[in-house]
Amino acid sequence: METSMARRAQTSLTALAALALLWAEPALALYPKKGDSDPHAGVRDARRRAIQGIDVSRWQGEIDWEKVKDAGTRFAFIKATEGGDHLDPMFRRNWAAAKKAGVARGAYHFVWWCRAAKDQVRWFKRNIPRDADALPPVLDVEWNGHSEACGKKIPREKALAKIREMLKGLEEHTGKKPIIYTDITFHEDVLEGEFNNYPYWLRSTAAPLAHRYQRKQWEFWQFTTTGRVPGITGDVDRNAFFGSESEFAAWRDGRYDIGARKWLRGEPKVAMPKPPTTPAGLRAPKAAGATPLRYVPPGKIPRSARAEVETTGSIVRD
C-alpha cells in the first residue's frame, strides 16, 4: 500500500512538473523532443519562441537531417568557410542533406582578422553555391583569441572597414542582405551602434539579451551551446527567431527586411475593428453610477468633452 501510494505521488509530481515546464515554455508542447544538457533559467524567453533552429559544423559529425526536421527545427546555419583557405569538411554534405529534409539553411563564414577581406570574400564565393532557396549568408565576427597565429585584436575602425567590405561581397554573391553573428565582447568593442539596418544574430547563453547588449533589436538569439536535438549526437547550439510565422515566411520570400523591420512588398492589410453595436431591443450598458456609454468615431469628440479626455483620459459620456 505504501509503495503504491508513493508511486502515485511520484507520478503526480512528475505530471505537475511537466505541466509547469510546458506552461513556462509552450514551444516544448509542439516539439517536446528538443532539450538541453545544461539549461539556464536566464534564457527561458528564447526557448518559448515558436521558430527554433540550430547551427552546426564538423563538430556535430554525421547528422540525420530528417530527424532534425521532425523534431521541429525550422532553420539551420551551417558553417562553410573560415578565413581565406579553410572549408568545413562537413559543409557540402550538410548543405545538401538539410535542403533535402526541408530545413531552411544558410551558410556562415568565420572571419579571420589577419586575412584580407577581399581574400575571404573570394574564398566564400568559390565554395558557396548561389541558391535562391537558401537563407541569407552569415558573417561570423568574433575576436580570434583562440588562435596563436591570428589572436591579436585589431583597431576598431580597421575591423569595421573589413566587415563593410565582406558584407558587401557576400551580398553581391548571394543577392541577399547578410546576417551579422557576434558575441558580447566583440559587439561591445566594435559593433555598438553600427550596421543597424542589418539583421543581428546574438549570443547570450546565461541571461536575456537585454542584460548583455545595449542593442534594443535582435533577429536571432543563440541561447545555448548545450542543446539536444534528435538526429544529432551530443550537444548542439540552439537558436530562436525573434518574430512570428508570417514574419519568418515573408523574410524567407524576400518580402520583409527583418533588420530594418520594413516590408519590401506584399505588406499585409490590417482591417480596423468596427465599433461595437447594441442589438435592437437592448439598451447600451451603463458604467457603474454613470450615464450610458456612447461610441464616438475618431475626430468627432464634442469640443466640450475633448479637453476632459485630453486631461483625464475619460471616455466620452452622454
Range-by-range predicted roles:
Residues A24-P26:
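N-terminal signal peptide c-region/cleavage motif recognized by signal peptidases
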Residues R74, A104, K177:
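Residue-level detector of anion-binding/catalytic polar loops
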Residues Y31-G53, F195-V309, V316:
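Functionally critical loop-and-helix segments that line ligand-binding/catalytic clefts
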Residues E2-L13:
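Bacterial N-terminal signal peptides that target proteins for export
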Residues A17-L22:
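Hydrophobic core
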Residues H40-I63, I78-R164, E171-H173:
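Substrate-binding cleft of extracellular glycoside hydrolase catalytic domains
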Residues P136-Q214:
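Catalytic domains of cell-wall/extracellular-matrix polysaccharide-remodeling enzymes
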